[in-house]
Amino acid sequence: MGKKKRSASSSRWLNEHFSDQFVQKAHKQKLRSRAYFKIDEIQQTDKLFKQGMTVVDLGAAPGGWSQYVVSQIGGKGRVIACDILEMDPIVGVDFLQGDFRDENVLNALLERVGEAKVDVVMSDMAPNFSGMPSVDIPRAMYLVELALDMCKQVLASKGSFVVKVFQGEGFDEYLREIRSLFNVVKVRKPEASRGRSREVYIVATGYKG
């Protein structure tokens, strides 16, 4: 049997990935992923993270965001992270492997958070994409709705929420809901986010809960 050839789209993605300046920088600096630079740019603009904070990181693997946040909140801070994929340990991060859509996993995560409210909830969750927007966008919107539900359960008054959202059906309604719950809401497209991608980051501060 002959070798299977990669599709044009997967070959293009690989070429883009390995020539991406942020992928190269992440490799040189021994960072978990290029996502580190996305949250860094958001922090430079929006100043979300401070020493001693407690942060929930959803869709954490391979750990770029958690790695960055630990550097901002210091030894007295705490990150509680969750992902369906494995993640190598990071000092200062309490990691739970499991599917966030599973109620048992959600309950285990809430148990780790404990009684005290958290300062920031952040979500970089994304579904496995099929290439069909009619399938992918609803899957992605379901995940961001779950992330917002998490905010409603654990986020402290005046807390912050950062969430990756893919523009498409349901985006405007989701943005409206967030604006009803937070005092200040911005839509960011960090430089490290690929231009072709539909992803944007909603940064919401001043939770009214």
Curated annotation (Swiss-Prot):
* Catalytic activity annotation: uridine(2552) in 23S rRNA + S-adenosyl-L-methionine = 2'-O-methyluridine(2552) in 23S rRNA + S-adenosyl-L-homocysteine + H(+)
- Similarity comment text for this entry: Belongs to the class I-like SAM-binding methyltransferase superfamily. RNA methyltransferase RlmE family.
InterPro entries tied to this protein: RNA_methyltr_RlmE, RNA_MeTrfase_FtsJ_dom, rRNA-MeTfrase_E, rRNA_MeTrfase_gammaproteobac, SAM-dependent_MTases_sf
Name the predominant localization. cytoplasm
Q: What is this protein called?
A: Ribosomal RNA large subunit methyltransferase E
Identify the Gene3D superfamilies for this entry.
Vaccinia Virus protein VP39
Q: Which UniProt keywords apply?
A: Cytoplasm, Methyltransferase, rRNA processing, S-adenosyl-L-methionine, Transferase
The record's HAMAP family line, in alphabetical order, gives:
RNA_methyltr_E (MF_01547)
Quote the subcellular location field of this record: Cytoplasm
Q: Give the organism the record lists.
A: Haemophilus influenzae (strain 86-028NP)
Q: Which residues form the TRAM domain?
A: 191-209
Name the Pfam families on file: FtsJ
Report the active site residues.
Answer: 164 (proton acceptor)
Q: Which GO terms describe its cellular component?
A: cytoplasm
> Which molecular function term from Gene Ontology is one that the record holds?
rRNA (uridine-2'-O-)-methyltransferase activity
List positions binding S-adenosyl-L-methionine. 63, 65, 83, 99, 124
